[in-house]
């Protein structure tokens, strides 16, 4: 194996129906951010569970996949993390879910954190990581007292949906504040769920005006950064988005270099 080559980033797929056939898919904008923003190869991980011989029902399968990776990217999605993943009941039966992705993503996150594998999460991925590590979520931010409506308007053009929506305050001494070179930044907002209780060993990196956590980093182990917004959307036009993917790439290349050194030593 050539360890000076591009790092390999795993991207967990959604399980959707298009129109009636089950399809494992990842949005093009996420793969573009991995290949062009991170400077890596994208490895799509299917959400395969609950069928005979399926991958990822055996914890060893998770490990074998992670053995091939230099980083893990958890993307956004139209579905929500099912509240059973953090010990709660479903408050709205109409809430879209993807329990196959829940199972694969959360299992991947837990094992990746144990290894110190670099992790980046956005939107749903931000919520998945928090749930995987012991945190909880607001199932409907817009119906939570004291919090604003953070959802997009479906009938708006995409450039409006993904356009700047509100400012976030960046934590003093935090990674994002250093990358942004400022105490605040404007972000888009396209989410119905949000962080309620932050998981242990995660530190707040950004907060919305209503107090909702919008970004966090891992305090122990390897590189872990997650944001509630969508930095992958036209990332080339946003200096902070560029830096988020660059620094994830730096962590992935460092991981790959260590893998190479370990392989040569053995």
Question: Residue spans of the language-model regions?
Answer:
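Conserved G/P- and acidic residue-centered "switch" motifs that form tight phosphate/ATP-binding loops
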Residues: 123
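Active-site-proximal beta-strand elements of phosphoester/diester hydrolases
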Residues: 225-228
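N-terminal beta1-alpha1 cap of cysteine-dependent amidohydrolase-like domains
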Residues: 1-120, 131-138, 142-180, 184-186, ...
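The feature captures the ABC ATPase H-loop/switch
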Residues: 126
